[in-house]
């Protein structure tokens, strides 16, 4: 692309010039880049910011565009500008034409339009005040137009006689004419929208370099790198440093830079008798040595946009002290990577300096945090986002106009799908970034939480970034607050736009259930599925009539690089048989035990009791804890039964039969049930305030439990690590087994089973006697399901996933001599194709072939029934049209499917490849068999599948000869 960056000057000191040069240096590697300037009073000096020789610099003769003769019109425009700057007289929508002409005369505009169109640029970017002028020209330019803000909203609109002072009405008319207006922070985005009604897009400035060398945290030197102008607050700095020097006689202050206020500030230092402590360096081409010889960076600015010097300071490991103005709190994490004293309070600024200067450990800690934080501002991320914007503008201009209605429908109907696809296609994978999700964002719990805590405790993983997916920020407030101080821990709202970005760009993905159907794993990503329990009740395709509902989970497991298993029983029951991964799963099953069970080998009793207390559950230390932890009931996981009377009846039974001087009861409902009854619980009597929130980890709770009462939940397997009693309460056994199914008969359980409350009450009256006959069975099941639980599961799994260490107990499912067939038979509405497929299944030798059917149309009752009736010897992957695709791909795919063409358009090849991967993971098939002649999604997509041959309904019998 041919890109022009238009600014007033470039070979001059200042953050804008620096970041423009930085971006241009990267863009010129892929594009033709010109920097156009017309007020640069300096000669060309590419060494100032190491400008690439490949960048063209176009020095504009401004006199060609502007008539500076003192004609009446010139004098009138001058008067209009002065009156408006003083009183805002012309800052009104009805007078926009007058003020616009005064700022940018029509004849001047005409010359600029002619000149810019002659250059044949694809994209024109303007900085600062020139964005308004570009907005005036935009409708007549051939190029796409982008305005680029380099200061905060207040710095542009609220500082007298600067940039857009008293020009709000002009901004409201002309900025929307730009194709994009870029701001530096979410605060600016909010203010432009709220105050001016202008839609903007955020792109932060990147760091300008990467340094292997870091500062010396022991150095007793402060550093400023700045321009000597009013906005930078050097007068405030002198006042604060004078106060600092009264309490300290060692630290020095180096100030790099120059400017109009140089003499004034130097004189101020002498007047305050601190000139021997301040080193006025002036301009330098070697700022690195000053960063390396300092340990704290100071920024007392009155206003800032997104200061480059902060990113530079972080890269060298310098914590930053800055006044809390603008977007500073989005860059500096207060008390983690620096301090943010109240704006312009020099006393608090001096106090922050003293605190960092006199606390060596705090300075070292903040230095490490600053280095971590620097990763957020990598130039690669910024360039990728800019390139994505360029491609979007160029690609979508014509395409959008031609397909506007269809695109808007896609964005409205498929917002999450299109957003995910955009991030997958356009954004790079972020190395050393780990995403954790448990039960759809319920909280920091289960196996993902155990792995997170392990990684956070190890020095070797200190430079990793951690992203936690959270559904309810209020419920998880305590944990969020706890980790706020860690700059490498971030929380993202479940099913938000940021969530789409996170699951699409994080290098490592850890989930204990499954990601949504619009998730498409990339080849560069590493997916660890930890699952969340050893099977007791039926799961996966073993559940009668639940095949369709299990489709997304099966797809997630097939996409996982690693799946965690508690042992051989779980591997065979859950993964090999229930989800039918045998023969086609290309990842590794890690039989290393559940990470969450490491909690049984740690003594965290007081910490867990503290969490319960803060939730309003006050347990007595001298009493044993009985925990009731039932599973969920109902036909659908998303809408479980929430009838509480059965729970309350159990509470009464327990309390009536236990010795209340020795025992106390708490209840941990299943994650999904708790969220559905949370509001109901709030209305119950306080005596029932024993329900443990879903945000508290179950295994932390089990570790302090003395007696477990379970039903059909798999938590009892984990609890066996404690060697403490477990009782089972099955008042609805026949109904539950009929609707769901169980892998274990009651007589094989490691504890007594009560079918009614009276029997349960009897067990509770003498627990020791009740469990005595089950001791041998208890030990047998424990040896089977807890074989690898030794307190080191997290360590083994982390070594395999993050270090590439060979797993200690790997299981592979892809070793088979069977011929693997991937079949498609449509929705079975066509009788001929349905008969063909039935005949195929009857004819094929299941001992020689492994058959996977892509099931579609399952939302149709008859089709769903047909799929359920198929032989259990074949594997059905249920495909639903919830695929992630860009709006362009949606529209092009729809157009292609309606056409008579059979040749897949090149622009859809990536989409079809992604969708096949989403459905089958890394599974490898030998042949494809398609039993329909209709032009449907899978037959079209199958043309891009790498197999030996594709058979059809006409020649499928040849498969039998293989």
Where do the model's predicted regions map?
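A short, well-ordered alpha-helix in the C-terminal region of glycosyltransferases
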Residues: 348, 355, 362-376, 384-388, ...
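Short hydrophobic beta-strand element within catalytic cores of glycosyltransferases
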Residues: 310, 319-322, 332, 708-709, ...
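Aromatic "clamp/platform" in nucleotide-sugar-dependent glycosyltransferases that forms part
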Residues: 283, 302
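Conserved catalytic-core segment of nucleotide-activated headgroup transferases in glycan assembly
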Residues: 230-257, 446-452, 595-679, 833-837
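Conserved donor-binding/catalytic core segment of Leloir-type glycosyltransferases
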Residues: 4, 182, 215-232, 238-241, ...
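Membrane-proximal helix-turn-helix segments that form the acceptor-binding/catalytic region
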Residues: 110-117, 162-181, 498-500, 548-563, ...
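Conserved acidic donor-binding segment of nucleotide-sugar-dependent glycosyltransferases
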Residues: 334-335, 339-346, 355-360, 752-756
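Donor nucleotide-sugar binding/catalytic pocket of nucleotide-sugar-dependent glycosyltransferases
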Residues: 144-147, 154, 170-211, 584-598, ...
């Amino acid at each position: 692309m041919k890109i022009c960056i238009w600014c007033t000057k470039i070979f001059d000191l200042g953050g804008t010039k620096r970041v423009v040069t930085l971006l241009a240096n990267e863009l010129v590697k892929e594009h033709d880049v010109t920097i156009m300037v017309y007020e640069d009073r300096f000669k060309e000096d590419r060494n100032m910011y190491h400008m690439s020789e490949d960048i063209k610099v176009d020095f504009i003769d401004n006199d060609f565009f502007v008539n500076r003769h003192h004609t009446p019109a010139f004098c009138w425009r001058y008067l209009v500008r002065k009156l408006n700057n003083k009183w805002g007289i012309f800052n009104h929508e009805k007078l926009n034409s007058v003020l616009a002409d005064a700022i940018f005369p029509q004849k001047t505009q005409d010359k600029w339009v002619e000149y810019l169109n002659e250059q044949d640029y694809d994209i024109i970017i303007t900085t600062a005040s020139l964005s308004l002028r570009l907005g005036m020209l935009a409708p007549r330019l051939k190029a796409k137009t982008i305005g680029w803000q380099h200061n905060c909203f207040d710095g542009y609109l609220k500082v007298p006689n600067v940039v857009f002072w008293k020009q709000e009405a002009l901004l409201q008319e002309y900025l929307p004419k730009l194709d994009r207006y870029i701001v530096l922070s979410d605060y600016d985005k909010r203010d432009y929208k709220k105050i001016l009604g202008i839609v903007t897009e955020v792109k932060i400035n990147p760091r300008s370099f990467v340094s292997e060398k870091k500062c010396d945290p022991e150095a007793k030197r402060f550093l400023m790198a700045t321009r000597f102008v009013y906005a930078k607050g050097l007068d405030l700095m002198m006042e604060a440093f004078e106060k600092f020097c009264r309490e300290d006689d060692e630290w020095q202050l180096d100030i790099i830079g120059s400017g109009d206020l140089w003499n004034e500030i130097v004189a101020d230092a002498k007047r305050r008798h601190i000139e021997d402590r301040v080193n006025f360096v002036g301009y330098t081409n070697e700022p690195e040595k000053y960063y390396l010889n300092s340990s704290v960076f100071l920024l007392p600015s009155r206003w800032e946009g997104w200061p480059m010097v902060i990113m530079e300071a972080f890269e060298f490991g310098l914590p930053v002290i800055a006044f809390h103005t603008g977007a500073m709190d989005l860059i500096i994490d207060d008390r983690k990577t620096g301090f943010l004293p109240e704006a312009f309070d020099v006393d608090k600024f001096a106090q922050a300096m003293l605190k960092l200067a006199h606390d060596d450990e705090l300075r070292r800690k903040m230095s490490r945090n600053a280095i971590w934080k620097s990763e957020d501002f990598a130039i690669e991320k910024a360039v990728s986002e800019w390139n994505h914007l360029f491609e979007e503008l160029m690609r979508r201009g014509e395409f959008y106009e031609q397909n506007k209605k269809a695109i808007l429908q896609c964005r409205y109907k498929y917002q999450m799908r299109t957003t995910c696809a955009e991030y997958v296609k356009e954004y790079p994978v972020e190395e050393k970034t780990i995403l954790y999700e448990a039960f759809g964002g319920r909280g920091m719990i289960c196996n993902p939480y155990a792995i997170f805590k392990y990684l956070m405790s190890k020095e070797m993983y200190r430079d990793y970034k951690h992203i936690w997916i959270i559904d309810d920020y209020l419920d998880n407030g305590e944990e969020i607050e706890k980790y706020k101080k860690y700059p490498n821990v971030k929380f993202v709202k479940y099913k938000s736009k940021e969530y789409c970005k996170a699951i699409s760009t994080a290098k490592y993905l850890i989930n204990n259930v499954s990601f949504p159907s619009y998730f498409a794993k990339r080849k560069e990503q590493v997916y660890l599925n930890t699952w969340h329990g050893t099977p007791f009740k039926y799961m996966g395709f073993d559940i009668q009539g639940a095949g369709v509902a299990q489709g997304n989970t099966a797809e997630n497991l097939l996409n996982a690089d690693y799946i965690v298993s508690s042992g051989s029983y779980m591997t065979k029951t859950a993964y090999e048989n229930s989800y039918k991964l045998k023969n086609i799963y290309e990842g590794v099953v890690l039989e290393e035990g559940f990470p969450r069970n490491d909690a049984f080998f740690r003594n965290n009793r007081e910490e867990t009791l503290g969490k319960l207390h803060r939730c309003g559950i006050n347990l007595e230390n001298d009493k044993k804890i009985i925990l009731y932890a039932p599973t969920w009931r109902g036909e659908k996981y998303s809408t479980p039964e929430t009838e509480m009377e059965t729970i309350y009846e159990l509470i009464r039974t327990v309390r009536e039969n236990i010795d209340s001087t020795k025992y106390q009861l708490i209840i941990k409902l299943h994650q999904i049930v708790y969220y559905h009854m949370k509001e109901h619980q709030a209305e119950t009597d306080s005596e029932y305030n024993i329900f443990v929130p879903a945000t508290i980890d179950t295994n932390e709770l089990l570790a302090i439990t003395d007696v477990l009462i379970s039903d059909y939940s798999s938590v009892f397997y984990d609890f066996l690590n404690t060697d403490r009693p477990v009782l089972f309460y099955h008042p609805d056994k026949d109904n539950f087994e009929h609707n769901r199914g169980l892998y274990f008969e009651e007589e094989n359980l490691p504890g007594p089973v009560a079918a009614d409350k009276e029997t349960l009450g009897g067990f509770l009256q003498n627990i020791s006697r009740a469990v005595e006959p089950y001791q041998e069975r208890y030990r047998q099941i424990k040896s089977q399901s807890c074989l690898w639980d030794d307190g080191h599961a997290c360590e083994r799994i982390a070594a395999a996933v993050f270090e590439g260490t060979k797993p200690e107990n790997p299981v592979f499912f892809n070793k088979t001599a069977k011929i693997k067939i991937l079949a498609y038979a449509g929705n079975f509405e066509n009788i001929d194709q349905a008969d063909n497929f039935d005949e195929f299944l009857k004819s094929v030798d299941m001992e020689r072939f492994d058959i996977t059917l892509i099931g579609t149309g399952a939302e149709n009752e008859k089709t769903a029934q047909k799929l359920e009736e198929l032989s259990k010897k074949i594997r059905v992957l249920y495909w639903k049209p919830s695929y992630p695709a860009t709006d362009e791909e949606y529209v092009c795919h729809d157009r292609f499917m309606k056409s008579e063409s059979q040749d897949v358009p090149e622009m859809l090849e990536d989409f079809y490849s992604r969708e096949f991967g989403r459905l089958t993971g890394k599974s490898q098939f030998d042949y494809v068999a398609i039993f329909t002649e209709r032009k449907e999604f899978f037959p079209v997509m199958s043309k891009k599948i790498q197999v030996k041959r594709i058979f059809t309904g006409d020649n499928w019998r040849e498969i039998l000869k293989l």
